[in-house]
Amino acid sequence: MTPKFKNFKHDNSGQVETYLFEVISKYTMLEIKTKFGKLCIAKVKLASESIERALNLCNDNCQIVSAKCHEEVIFATILAIKAFSSGRNTAKTIKGEILLRLAGVKQIKDAIKIIGARKGENLIIYFGVSDPCSSLKDFISSLGLREEPLKPCDEDEVKRGFERAAIIEAL
């Protein structure tokens, strides 16, 4: 498969930054190479009885969210990692920062209500490890889950998600 290249633009106080990364499909997972390291994302269906176990097994390099669009999760993760690397984070952890940016709010408890893991389709993203897709595959396997296909995101939904993730910079 030929790699696809995407640009995410983020307006931060009048400056436009472009994140160029390569997206490589592995099964239904996506591995994303960024200047902040590799990320890997997959979609799974969680039963209500497996949510707590999944959250407990999800370490500091993993986040599970109920977002509809994988592109907004990727963007929020990149912004969260960047915020931590520059000392502009609001949350105490990258996982928390991802939640805040996806939900577009400043309180973790509110973000969990809006975008936290729940019964049904969820996205799991791994970051901060040398082979995030291998870690993600092992995580999914350990829970006895099956990957679901990642479908293209609606363009308007992507824009709204990017705006929510970026608005945290201005708050």
From Swiss-Prot:
A GO CC annotation given for this chain: EKC/KEOPS complex
UniProt-annotated location(s): Cytoplasm
Alphabetized UniProt keyword annotations: Cytoplasm, tRNA processing
A GO biological-process term: tRNA threonylcarbamoyladenosine modification
Record Pfam families: CGI-121
Family in the record: Belongs to the CGI121/TPRKB family.
Job of this protein: Component of the KEOPS complex that is required for the formation of a threonylcarbamoyl group on adenosine at position 37 (t(6)A37) in tRNAs that read codons beginning with adenine. The complex is probably involved in the transfer of the threonylcarbamoyl moiety of threonylcarbamoyl-AMP (TC-AMP) to the N6 group of A37. Cgi121 acts as an allosteric effector that regulates the t(6)A activity of the complex. Cgi121 is not required for tRNA modification.
Subunit-level organization: Component of the KEOPS complex that consists of Kae1, Bud32, Cgi121 and Pcc1; the whole complex dimerizes.
UniProt protein name: KEOPS complex subunit Cgi121
Lineage, broadest ranks: Archaea, Methanobacteriati, Methanobacteriota, Thermococci, Thermococcales
Gene name linked to the record: cgi121
